[in-house]
């Protein structure tokens, strides 16, 4: 979010006083959870916009729909996909496959955990590799991602 904030301010001329950063997340599900709990819900926002690459948008949308859908006071979420540029066709296909697999896993988790923000918080902080203290020893270990998939990050 720091790079995005810099871009908004330096390239688009947005006032720094109009930009809020979310720096607690390590991934998309964290973006959804922390943007809601740190900014959107406490500040009573009426709308947020999720901007990401087209290949990533289906999973991003699933994350934001699940998390924001679990909060009665959550704002409406708009989605703005941007073009998939800057990678080979093979890398893009590898990433699309990875995104589909990750989206399927997310849907299974959402079904299991349900649409309750407290339950989602419990799940996120007890089972998710990025946020569960009982899994922090796994940081730095190889992921299941292939070399082609990793090149797209």
Model-identified regions with their sequence ranges:
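A structural signal for short, hydrophobic/glycine-enriched beta-strand patches
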Residues: 1-105
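A structured, mid-to-C-terminal "fold-capping" secondary-structure block
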Residues: 85-153
């Amino acid at each position: 979010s720091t790079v995005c904030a810099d871009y908004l301010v330096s390239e688009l001329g947005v006032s720094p006083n109009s930009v809020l950063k979310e720096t607690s997340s390590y991934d998309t599900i964290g973006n959804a959870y922390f943007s809601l709990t740190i900014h959107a819900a406490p500040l009573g926002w009426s709308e947020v916009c999720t901007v990401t690459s087209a290949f990533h948008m289906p999973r991003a949308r699933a994350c934001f729909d699940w998390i924001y859908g679990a909060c009665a006071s959550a704002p409406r979420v708009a989605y703005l996909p941007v073009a998939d540029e800057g990678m080979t066709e093979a890398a893009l296909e590898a990433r699309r496959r990875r995104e589909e697999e990750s989206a399927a896993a997310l849907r299974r988790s959402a079904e299991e955990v349900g649409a309750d923000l407290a339950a989602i918080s419990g799940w996120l902080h007890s089972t998710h590799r990025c946020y569960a203290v009982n899994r922090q020893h796994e940081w730095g270990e190889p992921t299941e991602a292939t070399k082609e998939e990793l090149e797209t990050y």
